[in-house]
Each structure stands twice: as structure tokens, then as C-alpha cells.
Amino acid sequence: MTYQEALALVRTEFETRKMTPNCEVIKTNRTLDGCHSFPITLYDRGDEIILNDLGDTKEVFFEVEHAEWQELCETHGFEFDHWRIIRPFKGMQDLYDFIDFLDFIADRFDPLDEDY
């Protein structure tokens, strides 16, 4: 699948906003903490198309250590590279999984949760 084909597929369900010629922000109606929208981008690396959070998730949950991020990502089938959550995009299920993972992160590290 080309980047343009992937982008057209994503746009069948979500609005996007161009950041650069090879990167689009995917708009969802979800937030990490009530203020920060889910940071999901579709990015063309040239050799593959990926979903990427641009490292913004760790900026919201800054108290979470690198090792914990690494473990969470590996456990749930994501890459964690240079503080970025990454997953290759092969189809819409990858995007749904990315959204579900960010939902999981938002619930796990909810700053309003007294147990956290």
C-alpha cells in the first residue's frame, strides 16, 4: 500500500491535518487526560508507513519511566523508539489498535485516579 492509499483509507473514517508532505495528524474524539488529544500521525518513512505518537504521550505522562513505556509497548505489540510509540500501518485494524492502546494508557495513568 502506498502512503496516498493509506491516507485515503484513514480518511474514510477520520479527518486528518497535514503536518509535512509525508506526515498527517489523525483526528480522533479522544483525549489522554481531558485536555490533550490523542497524538496519532500517519507517517511515510519511505520504506514503510507507520502510526506514530511523535513522543507526545510521554509528555503528558512525563512521570512514567522509559523502562515502563518500553515494557507496555512490547507487551501490547508496539515499538518504542526514542520515546515514540510506533506501529507499522498495514490497514485500519492497526489504527484501531493504536487508539485502543492510547485508551489503555489514558486509563492506566489517569491523573485524576486516586490509585495512580
Stretch-by-stretch model annotation:
Residues 79-116:
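Solvent-exposed, charged helical/coil patches
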Residues 20, 36, 61, 112-115:
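Generic marker of "main functional regions" within proteins
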Residues 6, 10, 14, 40, ...:
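Extended hydrophobic/Leu-rich segments
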Residues 10, 59, 108-112:
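Generic ordered-secondary-structure signal
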Residues 37-87:
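Intrinsically disordered, low-complexity regulatory segments enriched in Ser/Thr/Pro
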Residues 1-49:
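N-terminal ordered "arm"
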